[in-house]
Amino acid sequence: MNFVSLRVITDDVARLVAFYEQVTTVGARWATPEFAELVTPSCTLAVASTGTVALFGADSARPAANRTAIIEFRVADVDAEHRRLAAAGCVFVQEPTTMPWGNRSLLVRDPDGNLVNLFTPVTAEALQRQAR
């Protein structure tokens, strides 16, 4: 089994896609106006409208309702990403901080309030854990 995708449901697909395009520097692939994907080498972030929820069962998902998940992106240099996003006017939940488990992380919220972590493994243990 392979983990391949995370889907975020939103009331405003274009706004959320624009945010993730800015954060990841990956252009979205639009299937329909209600569904787009940002494809990276390791996983795909899908963004879908609330109109697609009925396809999975009525009221099976709601936008901006999840405060338990963190959408995470491993980056080559979190401090460089911080400078790039700060220059673009991004508001940070957490400035770059080295965590006890060896990742240097920064946190932002997407326009729907989902927590987004950009991190770089910086210790030998973290680098080994993140080796692919």
Predicted regions and their residues:
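Short, solvent-exposed loop/helix junctions and linker helices
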Residues: 10, 72-75
